[in-house]
């Protein structure tokens, strides 16, 4: 869960991973 995946991101990043 780093943010490279919108469903698995813990933080809002360029990958779209939002908590």
From Swiss-Prot:
Coiled coil recorded as keyword: yes
GO cellular component: extracellular region
GO terms of biological process kind: adaptive immune response; blood coagulation; innate immune response
Post-translational modification summary for this protein: Conversion of fibrinogen to fibrin is triggered by thrombin, which cleaves fibrinopeptides A and B from alpha and beta chains, and thus exposes the N-terminal polymerization sites responsible for the formation of the soft clot. The soft clot is converted into the hard clot by factor XIIIA which catalyzes the epsilon-(gamma-glutamyl)lysine cross-linking between gamma chains (stronger) and between alpha chains (weaker) of different monomers. Forms F13A-mediated cross-links between a glutamine and the epsilon-amino group of a lysine residue, forming fibronectin-fibrinogen heteropolymers.
Location in or out of the cell: Secreted
Keyword RNA-binding appears in the UniProt entry: no
Segment forming the signal sequence: none
Assigned keywords, A-Z: Adaptive immunity, Blood coagulation, Coiled coil, Disulfide bond, Hemostasis, Immunity, Innate immunity, Secreted
Task of the protein: Cleaved by the protease thrombin to yield monomers which, together with fibrinogen beta (FGB) and fibrinogen gamma (FGG), polymerize to form an insoluble fibrin matrix. Fibrin has a major function in hemostasis as one of the primary components of blood clots. In addition, functions during the early stages of wound repair to stabilize the lesion and guide cell migration during re-epithelialization. Was originally thought to be essential for platelet aggregation, based on in vitro studies using anticoagulated blood.
Domain notes: A long coiled coil structure formed by 3 polypeptide chains connects the central nodule to the C-terminal domains (distal nodules). The long C-terminal ends of the alpha chains fold back, contributing a fourth strand to the coiled coil structure.
Subunit field text: Heterohexamer; disulfide linked. Contains 2 sets of 3 non-identical chains (alpha, beta and gamma). The 2 heterotrimers are in head to head conformation with the N-termini in a small central domain.
Protein name: Fibrinogen alpha chain
Species name: Muntiacus muntjak
Underlying gene: FGA
């Amino acid at each position: 869960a780093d943010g490279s995946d919108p469903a698995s991101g813990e933080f809002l990043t360029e990958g779209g991973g939002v908590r």
